[in-house]
Amino acid sequence: MAGVRQHGWRAIPAVCSEYGADTLPDRYRSDGRCLLFRQQAGISALKQELEVKTPYRAMNHPVIGVVTKADLASMEQISLVKCWLREAGAHNVLVTSAVNNNGVTELFALLHTEEGCR
């Protein structure tokens, strides 16, 4: 497709403690601390000549917060992480567990709505 650019995703892992969030070179922790991922996801096809080049372009994208592995966390931990995600700018916060298949359908439904895709 000539003149079309596709954007992928990237993930930045971080561990939250009482001192804040620290980025990690590895993806998983075995010490039980809360692991967060900030992902910028989206596949869009834009004509290159219409693409706006600005360092603040990502600021106009919607933010969806997703709490994963909910089957391993307590309700208190889940509530705390949901609060952090809302404070970070997430308009929609979903709780998911692939083991129990909880929240996965809701996540896909949100991603396929105009509100989730804007």
Swiss-Prot record:
UniProt-listed GO biological process terms: biogenic amine metabolic process
Signal sequence interval, chain numbering: none
Domain of life: Bacteria
Gene Ontology MF term list: ATP binding
The name this protein goes by in its record: Uncharacterized protein YoeF
Lineage: Bacteria, Pseudomonadati, Pseudomonadota, Gammaproteobacteria, Enterobacterales
